[in-house]
Amino acid sequence: MDETNDSENKRVENWLRIRGFDLFAVMDPARWPEPLRESFRTLDINLPMGTRIVLLGSVGRTLWEIVRRDHWQDSDPIDRYSIRIVEELRKLHWHGQKIEWLHPGPCPIPIQRLCRQAGWSHPSLLGLDIHAQFGTWFACRAVIVVSRSIECTPRESSRSPCESCLEKPCRSHCPSGAVTDIEAFGLMACGSYRLAKESNCAHLCLSRLACPIGTSQRYSDVQLDYHGALSLTSLQAAREQAE
C-alpha cells in the first residue's frame, strides 16, 4: 500500500467528518463481482481501468444539523450541500481532478449494492439497508467516478445485525404486514398503507423506529418528517402516473 495515498485518505476522512460525512469509501470497480460491473454496463456507465468509485455517507443527525443551520435556503439542500462539499474536496485534495457525478443524478445506479460492496450495509427486513453499528440511520449522499488511482479504502467487515436479532420487533410493529423476510419485503403493501387516509405511517416507519440497532443515531422528529414527506410525495406521484 502506498503510505502517502493512505495518509491522504485519512486526511480526507477527517476533513469530511467535520463537514457531516462520517462514511467514506474508495473502490476499484475492477475488483467488483461481475454482476455489479454488469449493472453499470447496462446503464452505459463506462468505468475504465484505473478509475475509482467514491462514496460519501452520513450517519445520524450531524449532516442534517449542519445543513439546517447553514444551508437550508437552498432548494434540495442536502443534495446541494453534498455537491458543494465534493467540489471542495476535488479542488483541495484531488488537485482539481476530473470527476463524474453518479449520485445525486438522474441515472438509477444501484446505491444499495454499492453500499454493500463497500461493507457499509446489509439487506434488512425493512427494505432499507442496515449498518451493523448505525442501524438504518445512515445514508449514501454522493457517488462519483474519479479518473485517478486514489488508494482504495479498506472494506468494512461485519455481519448483518438482523441475523442475531431474535425478537425482530420490526415485524410486529408493521401495521401493513409488509415486514416479513429479508428476501420478501412487501413494497406494495407498504406503499398502499402509507397512502391510505389517516395512515400512521405516512411520514415515518413504525418498524424502523422499533429496530433496536443504532438507536443513538436515530434521526430527529423534524428530520424524519422531512424525509418522510419527500418519499410520500414520490409515492403519490407514482400512483397518479399509474392511474
Residue ranges and their predicted role:
Residues 167-192, 198-243:
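Iron-sulfur cluster-binding cysteine motifs and their immediate structural context
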